[in-house]
């Protein structure tokens, strides 16, 4: 078995991202193996890490003066004057939010809801989420509701998956250097759902479960 050593050079937050710089001491590897190892790390970081995001959303409307509220569904192309911006843009705002789970999330799909009862602006902090789930940035304005005659409910899927749409990884760079080429420098940028160090550890566990020990 070939052995290598990993050193943490930098690990900090910058402009809404976590940044990490790591050095892999690969003296026992050939030059081709070092490049292959760098490609494997980059590919796994970008494609295989799991994350959560909002999926499809549904909006329901009811007249506020009804004694027993009856909500009927409207589609995303409906023009509701009381909602600004358009429903299409509202749903897009949901999909652009990042969700963090404080504990392992085992479900493939869960749901969130916003109850729109008064005329005001609604933010990501108004989303009702299952236990242990949080929106990373709670102050994103989703829409403005301009009516006192209606009530709305917006229900959104919370989906778990891997790949670019779900992964917390924003960018990965690496370079093989040294004389001879004995080191691999790896840069990782993540959003605020995970830091660079925890993302690298999760990647190593995916590549080889023995790293979990």
Curated annotation (Swiss-Prot):
Enzyme class, broadest EC rank: transferase
Gene Ontology process terms (BP): DNA-templated transcription
- Which pairs are disulfide-linked? none
Recorded GO CC terms: chloroplast; DNA-directed RNA polymerase complex; mitochondrion
Q: Where in the cell is it found?
A: Plastid, Chloroplast
Q: Which UniProt keywords apply?
A: Chloroplast, DNA-directed RNA polymerase, Nucleotidyltransferase, Plastid, Transcription, Transferase
List the SUPFAM superfamilies: Insert subdomain of RNA polymerase alpha subunit, RBP11-like subunits of RNA polymerase
| Pfam family for this entry, one | RNA_pol_L
Where would you say this protein principally sits, based on its record?
Answer: plastid
EC number(s) of the enzyme? 2.7.7.6
Question: Would the keyword Nucleotidyltransferase turn up in this protein's UniProt record?
Answer: yes
**Keyword Iron-sulfur among UniProt keywords:** no
Which GO molecular-function terms appear in the entry?
DNA-directed RNA polymerase activity; protein dimerization activity
Q: According to the lineage, what is the superkingdom?
A: Eukaryota
Catalyzed chemical reaction(s) = RNA(n) + a ribonucleoside 5'-triphosphate = RNA(n+1) + diphosphate
Q: Name the InterPro entries on file.
A: DNA-dir_RNA_pol_RpoA/D/Rpb3, RBP11-like, RNApol_insert_sf
Family note: Belongs to the RNA polymerase alpha chain family.
Protein role: DNA-dependent RNA polymerase catalyzes the transcription of DNA into RNA using the four ribonucleoside triphosphates as substrates.
The subunit structure is: In plastids the minimal PEP RNA polymerase catalytic core is composed of four subunits: alpha, beta, beta', and beta''. When a (nuclear-encoded) sigma factor is associated with the core the holoenzyme is formed, which can initiate transcription.
What is this protein's record name?
DNA-directed RNA polymerase subunit alpha
Source organism per entry reads Euglena stellata
Q: What is the lineage of its organism?
A: Eukaryota, Discoba, Euglenozoa, Euglenida, Spirocuta
Which gene codes for it? rpoA
